[in-house]
């Protein structure tokens, strides 16, 4: 299984980098992990709705250019489906069974994802109705993917 995480914005905090490194190391026995960081566009404090749409489209184009044709794209979006850790485990297993062994999770920037990215998505997932910093969310996503593999393999971790 190949898993790519495309994320808008660079990690700045060392403690988050350490957490990502730890989960990347743990995941290496289950999948080939590739993390793609894309430069976010600066959003002025007084940005209009039109300005925000332009920024989302620019970030969206960067995301779309990073997606390969053979990838099964999973967007992380507030309008996505909320599922449990067990359901995520089954979902990842089922993707592999159906021949979708190149999963691509997409984390948008502070303004969210463009319509073009949402249209390219094969599945939309929502972790919570709450808003999280995208840097922290990257750690949360990696932890849930790791948990999903542990559940799938019947290994102790999930409680």
Swiss-Prot record:
Location (main, coarse): cytoplasm
Catalytic activity: pseudouridine(1915) in 23S rRNA + S-adenosyl-L-methionine = N(3)-methylpseudouridine(1915) in 23S rRNA + S-adenosyl-L-homocysteine + H(+)
Gene3D superfamilies: 3.40.1280.10
Cystine connections: none
GO molecular function, one term: rRNA (pseudouridine-N3-)-methyltransferase activity
Keywords: Cytoplasm, Methyltransferase, rRNA processing, S-adenosyl-L-methionine, Transferase
GO cellular component, one term: cytoplasm
Subcellular location: Cytoplasm
Subunit structure: Homodimer.
UniProt-listed HAMAP family: 23SrRNA_methyltr_H
Family per record: Belongs to the RNA methyltransferase RlmH family.
Function (record text): Specifically methylates the pseudouridine at position 1915 (m3Psi1915) in 23S rRNA.
Name of the protein in its database record: Ribosomal RNA large subunit methyltransferase H
């Amino acid at each position: 299984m190949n898993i790519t995480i495309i994320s808008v914005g660079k990690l700045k905090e060392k403690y988050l980098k350490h957490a990502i490194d730890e989960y990347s190391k743990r995941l290496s026995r289950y999948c080939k992990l590739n993390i793609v960081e894309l430069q976010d566009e600066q959003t002025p404090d007084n940005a209009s709705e039109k300005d925000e749409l332009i920024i989302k489209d620019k970030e969206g184009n960067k995301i779309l250019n990073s997606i390969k044709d053979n990838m099964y794209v999973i967007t992380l979006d507030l309008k996505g489906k909320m599922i449990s850790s067990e359901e995520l485990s089954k979902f990842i297993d089922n993707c592999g069974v159906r021949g979708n062994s190149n999963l691509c999770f997409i984390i948008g920037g502070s303004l969210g994802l463009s319509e073009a990215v949402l249209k390219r998505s094969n599945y939309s997932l929502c972790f919570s109705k709450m808003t999280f910093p995208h840097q922290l969310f990257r750690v949360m996503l990696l932890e849930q993917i790791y948990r999903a593999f542990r559940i799938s393999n019947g290994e102790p971790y999930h409680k």
